[in-house]
Amino acid sequence: MRLKKVMATGLVAALALSTMVGCSSKKDSSDQKKIGVVQLVEHDALDASYKGFKDGLEKAGYKDGDKIKIEYKNAQNEQSNCQTIAKQFVTDKCDLVLAIATPAAQAMANESKDIPILVTAVTDPADAKLVQSNKK
């Protein structure tokens, strides 16, 4: 069941990227979409989320270094590092951010209202004040 959720996250990311990636076949690095990944801490479940995200993107045709450039940052279980990383992703003008774990998602949401943010490993997004409601 958890694997399905992880793969679903990757597929959602691929769909989000497909709206941002043009039809150009040119492989200039300036055409690459920047994806930031902020992970709170190294942990098997969180690592699996990141792996599922990358696998889902690759399955949808988005390989790191080709159409996209993934910048992975681990906050080493320091919330202040999450904030610093989030600020850096805003400065870098990432096109999409994957936030893994609640503090990472909260830091990213506090820093940007313009960058699409995918969250995973968040038990209750509404309780974490990431969304107004968990209902559609």
Model region roles, listed by residue range:
Residues R2-A14, S18-T19, C23-K136:
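Short hydrophobic alpha-helices and adjacent helix-cap/hinge residues
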